[in-house]
Amino acid sequence: MFLPVFVMIALPLTAQQLYWPRDLRQAYQNQTRSNDGWPGKKYWQNTGRYDITVTALPPDRTIRGTEQITYINNSPDTLFGLVFNFIQNIHKPGVTRLGDASPDYLTDGVHVDRYTDNGTEEQWGHEDGGTLQFKRLSEPLLPHDSVRLSFEWHYEISLKSGREGMIDSTTYYLAYFYPRVAVYDDVAGWDDIEHNDALEFYNDFNNYTLQVKVPRNYLVWATGNLLNAPEVLQPKYLQRLQASGKTGQLVHIADSADLAGRQVTAQQDVNTWKFAYDDISDVALGLSDHYVWDASSVVVDASTGRRASVQAAYNDTAMDYHHMTDYEQSALTFLSGQWPGVPYPFPKMTVFQGYAGMEYPMMANDETYQNFEFSRFVAEHEISHTYFPFYMGIDETRYGFMDEGWATTFELLYNRTVMSRDSADDFYRQFRVNNWIEDNSAEEDLPIITPGDDIGGRGLGNNEYGKPSLAYLSVKDLLGDDLFRKCLHGFMERWHGKHPLPWDFFYSFNSISGKNLDWFWNAWFFSHDYIDLAVSNVQNRGGDWEVHLDNIGGFPVPVDLLVTYTDGSTVTVHRTPAIWEQDPARASIALGSKKSVRSVTLVHGIYVDADAANDTFEVK
């Protein structure tokens, strides 16, 4: 009706209202989104069922696949065609990518050998296409109807391994290996952004069955539950796998001696490993004939006692990986019980030794490092992506700060529990903050809300990692842990398995906290601000000392002051970002002491200041 729509649109039109893109405004009008942070009463999203069979026969580099897709149109729109992702085409010469490509990276891309639309074979006709391809349907796909599609395809795995590719001649990591329907959502319509090899992804939640055909003596690790372990593993190794799911002790399912004996798997010429999982955003897999296999498990839900399997697949020479299941147990315990404090939602987690430092549902593809502490740091970061984007359905392409920013935040909070706070904060400053704050070029101050596909270079990484993480940590300080946790959990409960946008996050926190935080969101996400505070004056007002601060950079950050008195004693005074709510440029802090002050210094911690020259005020 007209009046509720008018009220809904009018609500944010107050001081410091948040900018609304026109497509978001239309979604509010259509009632698929609501500015109280809830999905609208007419919210919808599309989904599919994917039945995939993929064949890899190393050292042959050709990967062959077949799939049947049932795509379900839950939208109110009639779709005359579908947009498909062919991410493997990023390896084709001439495809637009953000960065150079070595000869070992390049391939011919994906070749579609056969395609059917509702059982009728058709020419695909996109052999020269890139990572995004449109195909008109033989009949329009009506609202709340479905279409059955099938593909047969092949491609050559890249010699250079990154997020996916050949790790060695008998070890492959397969990701983004199948044709999939792109996201069609209630705000942007089709996700029509070509993959450029720098940005990440945006996927629907689908039901998957995955069959992986490999030669005997090859092990396979993949997203989902392994359905036929008795068919692919010899009894001794099956028993070890089953035992690992019931203990917190390390189980060597297959060590280097076992693998050398060539009797770990069933001895058919080709074994078919079957995996399945529903309501998940992607699948990935690793395979090898010489990677050792470790496993254990850990309780991830204290209320039910539910355990999750933790597994590691690696070359036995990778010393850090001998501790990987310990790192995984530690990470899942922290993530489930502390931050975000939501029980790990999947039945397992596998870290596979590769070259990426990349996350996938239930999988991570991580390098090996001589520094074990750094190896744990990387593993926890990738595992924390379980929640953002895989639990929450984030559009990583446009709004990467909604997943990388949270993973970076959880990474810091986790590191503070496994190393000293000073060491954890040093890690964070070194890898997440310094490169941004010490670079005063224009691209570093682009608003975080700027869609990632419109940014390149240094500005993109800092807008996705350090800057938003500092924002999340600042609002945590502003609200306090209990209210922040309530807001975070409420947002996650509202949008789990859906496609939240930044505004859904902002307005969820507003409504759950009972506070209008638009002043905070505006400064951190929509402005060109940065961190630069100054102590402008310290005054004695009738025996009561007051510190005056200027916020030159504009970001509303927490404030810590080191106050040194004339008697040599010191005290640290903390204020939350609330001091910037009424006046974002200036604030005064009453010290609450009548002792004479000698000096006041800003102590920034992780909130590194762009100009330290004005951080100390000496009282004359």
Model-predicted regions and their roles:
Residues 94-105, 154-208, 228-229, 606-620:
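Glycine/proline-rich low-complexity spacer/linker segments in large multi-domain proteins
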